[in-house]
């Protein structure tokens, strides 16, 4: 069984909890300390300690931090374990209200922690709120629209050939995605491109890709054929049927659709099978979860650092000052913001590379990096990647 690493469970926590820019209205060190206590209590089956530590951790996260819904989910399940349906429903409702990634409540269907409250009126009322979910459609430029509210940022390229989607959101959001598209066009969906295998990006495949070609990296299809662990004890069954990609992309490819060239680049790092999509004529780039806009000053390069640098150099060379960059989560940014994050990442990579060349240990490199203001988890991760290449 393939398990999501801790970094994925916390929405790429390595990137989001590093650096001073994220802590302007919160204290992430305090958050980490209390959250680790909560996980230790959970492992010890101490429900009271689990709940208390989560309540202590939550206020230290900034208001729009991408990890807030993850902590809200844990708080809901902690109260559900004690049979407190009102408190569990309150935290699930807060997830939906915040609209960061409220549809993470999808996982409650597979989480036995919610069994004590599943039949309660308050829990059912929250789940019914999903039926009224709105996905908004905003025209970006050219043929491309941004669909928000489905669990991830979806790009929709629309024209006479039909609709091409980049990512599909959670399955719970698929009806709302179709309603949003219906306000733009009556054309059918012809392509769905999955940037990677995580449920918030592929859950809508079965509905949105029912009459379309679903494109993804072979590693994404491999992952979808296996059960996926969200958190300990919460396992999503394998995908089947229309949920599975049928067009597999292992090398850069281009397709002509709606009068423009659409380039698809493999860029592993967040997972083993990440894809990014460049709409040449519309001048839009969708980075999936390879870029968390404004959440971190860096971009995680992954284990294949040299391949990452080569691909990013080629990709950035195609961008213009007017390029709009869609991240898997967070705001649309100009190309300059993506480039700034990339240049900061190159500086970090070069620092670690020099330390490795000088035969420094990982502990020495972490200490040197800390003195330079580099986040220690990033230094250690890049050190490991470079020494394994």
What residues fall within each predicted segment?
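Metallo-beta-lactamase
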Residues: 162-163, 169-172, 254, 261-351
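Conserved beta-strand hairpin/beta-sheet module of binuclear metal-dependent hydrolase folds
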Residues: 138-180, 277-279, 283-289
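Active-site HxH/HxHxD metal-binding segment of metal-dependent hydrolases
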Residues: 179-254
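Accessory terminal helices/loops
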Residues: 81, 112, 116-131, 316-324, ...
